[in-house]
């Protein structure tokens, strides 16, 4: 099974109109589910709850630890989904309303908003919007606690080999936005991640 983004869903009921809530229940569920995610050697990125009438969808986003590269495999998504479903089914503080459980991993196009996101993207080409500075296109060479080092790549005419500049270190607090650029060498990987971010699989 290739490393890629995946989504698994456990269907409990049907829904009509959809709304999103942000409340302490999400924090409670994150604390409840995190040990099982860590036991699966994954990182719990986010837990969100979407409500449609009396029905809920619990969306859990998991990722690999920051020192690893690649994507979360479909097998890993399926395994952790089963464990999380069991925990939710036996949650003593649950109000008993029906729910769907959706477990997914971040897509390659997610914004790089935390240091761990930059660690996960090591070696990738990124486009960076710098506060009070020029926008940069470069490859991530290394990531520290407070900054990222890029090897700039200067865009040239079509058909010409890109020119690399000297490494430059940018503090995270000077980065307004960062995003991975899709390269031809990563097209297959990106296509798999996009594919598995689509319709859910039954758990």
UniProtKB/Swiss-Prot annotation:
It comes from the Bacteria. The keyword Cytoplasm applies. Residues 1-21 have a biased composition (Polar residues). SUPFAM superfamilies: YhbC-like, C-terminal domain (SSF74942), YhbC-like, N-terminal domain (SSF75420). GO terms for cellular component: cytosol. Residues 1-23 are annotated as: Disordered. The keyword Cytoplasm applies. One of its GO terms (biological process) is translation. Keywords: Cytoplasm, Ribosome biogenesis. Its main location: cytoplasm. Pfam families: DUF150_C (PF17384), RimP_N (PF02576). InterPro entries: Ribosome_maturation_RimP, RimP_C, RimP_C_sf, RimP_N, RimP_N_sf. It is found in: Cytoplasm. Belongs to the RimP family. Required for maturation of 30S ribosomal subunits. This is Ribosome maturation factor RimP. The gene is rimP.
């Amino acid at each position: 099974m290739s490393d890629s983004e995946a989504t698994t869903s456990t269907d409990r009921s049907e829904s009509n109109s959809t709304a999103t809530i942000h409340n302490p229940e999400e924090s409670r569920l994150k604390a409840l589910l995190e040990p099982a995610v860590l036991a699966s050697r994954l990182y719990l990125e986010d837990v969100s709850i979407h409500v449609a009438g009396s029905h809920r969808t619990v969306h859990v986003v998991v990722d690999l630890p920051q020192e690893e590269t690649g994507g979360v495999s479909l097998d890993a998504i399926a395994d952790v989904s089963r464990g999380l479903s069991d925990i939710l089914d036996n949650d003593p503080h649950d109000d008993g309303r029906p729910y769907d459980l959706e477990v997914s991993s971040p897509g390659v196009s997610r914004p790089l908003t935390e240091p761990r996101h930059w660690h996960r993207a090591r070696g990738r080409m990124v486009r960076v919007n710098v506060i009070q500075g020029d926008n940069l296109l470069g490859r991530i060479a290394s990531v520290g606690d407070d900054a990222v080092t890029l090897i700039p790549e200067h865009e040239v005419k079509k058909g010409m080999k890109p020119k690399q500049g000297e490494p430059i270190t940018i503090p995270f607090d000077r980065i307004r936005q960062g995003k991975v650029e899709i390269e031809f060498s990563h097209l297959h990987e990106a296509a798999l991640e996009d594919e598995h971010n689509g319709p859910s699989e039954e758990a």
